[in-house]
Regions:
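Membrane-interface capping segments at transmembrane-helix boundaries
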Residues: 177-190
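Hydrophobic, membrane-inserted alpha-helices
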Residues: 5-11, 88-91, 146-156
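The feature identifies polytopic integral membrane transport proteins across all domains of life
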Residues: 109, 129-142
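Helix-coil boundary and interhelical linker segments in multi-pass alpha-helical membrane proteins
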Residues: 1-5, 32-50, 92-107, 157-164
Length: 192
């Protein structure tokens, strides 16, 4: 990957980690191990080891089911508050190429901030709104949707990073609009 595409890939993978910590890491590990789409430099090439792939697979299964069980999903989100930004930092640094080679701390911080921001939006705005409006019934479908989005974004971030950038801009714009609309409605209700 060249510098431009590796930057988009890094941002895409770290954003994806904000939704599910293990999907982007497992995607990177599997694609690095079995294809030429991504080449990991040391120390990130450890992700290609079988024991790491196996561990990520087990953690993904645990996260998948924990996020679908009421009450357990809240505990999972608390734990993931630390795990997802860390996974985002690793995904960013592993895929950022030149940036990670010259400024590893900078790439780790960027990944941490991107994944942390996505996770914060998910756990502080989206999930509470879904829980409040559906009485918790919508949490499982939203969780499945988050896993699907994380998987698609992880693959797009590596295969077609420019397309990911366009999708990320659209999703970010929609999310800002949604927050603004929600705040406006809340303000209008408070005036009544």
């Amino acid at each position: 990957m060249n510098l431009f595409t590796s930057i988009f890939s890094a941002f895409g993978l770290s954003a994806s980690a904000g939704l599910n910590a293990y999907i982007p890491l497992l995607t990177v590990a599997l694609l690095a191990r079995f294809t030429d789409l991504i080449e990991l430099s040391s120390p990130w090439d450890t992700l290609e080891d079988w024991w790491v792939i196996g561990t990520l697979s087990v953690l993904l299964l645990i996260e998948f089911f924990a996020d679908k069980i009421p009450a357990v999903n809240h505990i999972n989100d608390i734990i993931q508050t630390f795990v997802r930004p860390t996974a985002g930092a690793i995904a960013f640094a592993a895929s950022a190429g030149v940036i990670a080679d010259s400024q590893p701390a900078f790439s780790l911080i960027l990944g941490l901030l991107v994944a942390g921001g996505v996770h914060a939006a998910k756990s502080l705005a989206i999930r509470p709104a879904v829980t409040a409006t559906t009485g918790g019934v919508g949490n499982v479908p939203i969780s499945i949707l988050e896993d699907i989005i994380s998987t698609v974004l992880s693959i797009l971030a590596i295969v077609i990073p420019i397309l990911f950038a366009a999708i990320a801009i659209v999703i970010t714009a929609w999310f800002v609009w949604w927050l603004w609309r929600r705040a406006s409605r809340t303000e209008a209700r408070q005036r009544m």
